[in-house]
Every structure is written in C-alpha cells, then in structure tokens.
Amino acid sequence: MRHRKSGRQLNRNSSHRQAMFRNMASSLVRHEVIKTTVAKAKELRRVVEPLITLAKSDSVANRRLAFARTRDAEVVGKLFNELGPRYQERPGGYTRILKCGLRTGDKAPMAYIELVGRPEAAEAVEADDAE
C-alpha cells in the first residue's frame, strides 16, 4: 500500500529519479526556463524551491548543502550570487508552470517551468509594450 508516500515514481527507480531531478534542477537554475512534461515539472518544483530558499541566506554551510544536492559549482554560484538576492523579499513560489500542448509522438502533456521574475521575460514584456 502506498499510504502517505508522497511524490511521483515516473516509472523510474530511485537513483534514476534522483539523478534526473538533479540534472533538471541544474538546467533550470542555469537557463531559468526548461521544457518538460507536466508531471516532471510539478515534481521538479519540489526540488528547486527549497534550493532557492536555501540560497536566500548565504553561508558556507548552505553552499555545501546546495552543492550536495546539485553537484555543480557553477549552479551553486548562480543560486547564491543571483537567485538568492533576487528572491530575498519573496516568501516562496519561485517557479511558474506554463502548459504548452502535447508532445509529438506520444501526446505527453508538455509544460515550460520557469523562474518567476526572470530578467529576459521582463525585457520581452517591455519590448512588446514599447511597440
């Protein structure tokens, strides 16, 4: 019975899931928007949001915890130097999931997961307003 077992299995074993979400979290932090399935996006939110909350208070211990979860020094640097200060006043909800139709081939529901308030998105909106 799966009573009180949270999280999706996604038809993978635990080490595969852990590696997949570690890679997806690194990609999301690096690029600030990625395209994936809706189920993976909803699970990825549970991985990335605590990382950003951790990055809001910069300390050696927090950097080591973030590195243990991502295994990528570049991502840890961006988390603590850019994203932590950017979301200092926001109490949570750092990601947004936008559904974008079905994948060609297997009709899996796809979605973009992005970081809220990313500078590229703000510049695009300002450019549209100027026209």
From Swiss-Prot:
Domain of life: Bacteria
CC terms in the record's Gene Ontology section: cytosolic large ribosomal subunit
Keyword Hydrolase: no
UniProt xrefs under Pfam families: Ribosomal_L17
The UniProt record lists the keyword Repressor: no
This protein's UniProt keywords: Ribonucleoprotein, Ribosomal protein
GO biological process terms on file: translation
An example molecular function term from Gene Ontology annotations: structural constituent of ribosome
Subunit structure: Part of the 50S ribosomal subunit. Contacts protein L32.
Family, as annotated: Belongs to the bacterial ribosomal protein bL17 family.
UniProt protein name: Large ribosomal subunit protein bL17
Organism encoding this protein: Shewanella violacea (strain JCM 10179 / CIP 106290 / LMG 19151 / DSS12)
